[in-house]
A protein has these predicted regions:
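Conserved, structured core segments of small domains
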Residues: 1-97
């Protein structure tokens, strides 16, 4: 089954409002946990710079049978539903297959 990668950057407007940002991120964490309990192979985390400082965005990896179904799941991410991030979804292709 193919893997899909969602890349994201938090919108600058939300960098100021830490309480709202934290609330939405916590909803996102709960959403990922729920999907894992449903048996979906998903990983999600944030990126840090060379000083281990967060703020450069995040990455989500999802195993799904096709792009359409991956997109359907991703669009339910609270970070997307609340317009917290600029995001893009791509399929990862293993050239060694």
């Amino acid at each position: 089954m193919p893997f899909f990668v969602k890349t994201e950057i938090i919108k600058k407007d939300y960098l100021i409002n830490n309480d709202l940002k934290r609330k939405i991120i916590n909803e996102h964490i709960d959403w990922v946990k729920k999907l894992k309990k449903e048996g979906i192979n998903i990983k999600s985390g944030f990126l840090v710079d060379e000083l281990n400082k967060p703020g450069d965005g995040g990455l989500l990896i999802l195993e799904m049978n096709n792009y359409r179904n991956a997109l359907k799941i991703i669009k339910n991410d609270p970070m997307i539903k609340n317009d917290l991030v600029e995001w893009k979804l791509n399929e990862w292709v293993d050239p060694n297959k």
